[in-house]
Amino acid sequence: GGGANRALSSSSNGLEKRPKLRFPGFDEPWNESKLSACFAKNIKKNTDGRISNVICNSAKMGLIPQRDYFDKDIANSDNTSGYYIIEHNDFVYNPRKSSDAPYGPISRYACPDAGIVSPLYLCFRAKGDVDTNFFEWYFRSFAWHRYIYMTGDSGARHDRVSIKDDDFFSMPIRFPSSIEQKKIASFLSAIERRISFQQLLVDNLKKYKRGV
């Protein structure tokens, strides 16, 4: 949302070295690197068909089981051998554009059980001292959109971003120390929980008024 965008991208391109809004005690510049320094492509496939938990990457709901999204299983075990296996805290990029995700959603897989995703998706996994909660918020912001806009080729299909894997992992990113990453992610998550709770109160009040 807007809060994440303001917290994670204080400049026009989202790559401010020293964000204007900081927690007390943190004043060192953010690290500057490529996505490949923090993440590696995940290419493990479901060759033996062992995993049947097909996961969809929805712009609104994130990574959820296909059976929950469509109310039934669409893919069958005969055609999932080419699907990628994802595990807890892996990230998945769905290049399909939508009004909610103009450059396609990048979502973190929060479920504990392994799942499989379409080979049309790009899967990647954190390496080293990376806080996946922070980067979940990072990818929910628009900090990376300009790079995809400048680098990707949407000419082939207007509804889908076309970007080479090497170009995707060359994406420039800026991020703070792991301690500050955790603090930022915790802060944004707390705000989101507060907003959700307030929305629940509003919804319940509306239901009450309709019933009176």
Task: Give a label for each model feature.
Residues G1, N5-S12, K20-P24, I184-I195:
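Hydrophobic structural patches
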Residues A114-L120, D153-I179:
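A short glycine-rich beta-alpha junction/loop motif
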Residues R18-N46:
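Non-catalytic DNA-recognition/assembly elements of restriction-modification systems
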Residues S81-W144, S154-R157:
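A short beta-sheet element
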Residues D48-C56, M150-G152:
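Short coil/turn segments at secondary-structure boundaries
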Residues S36-T47, S58-F91:
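Sequence-specific dsDNA recognition surfaces
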Residues N13-E16, K183, I195-R210:
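Extended intrinsically disordered, low-complexity coil regions enriched in Ser, Thr, Gly, Ala
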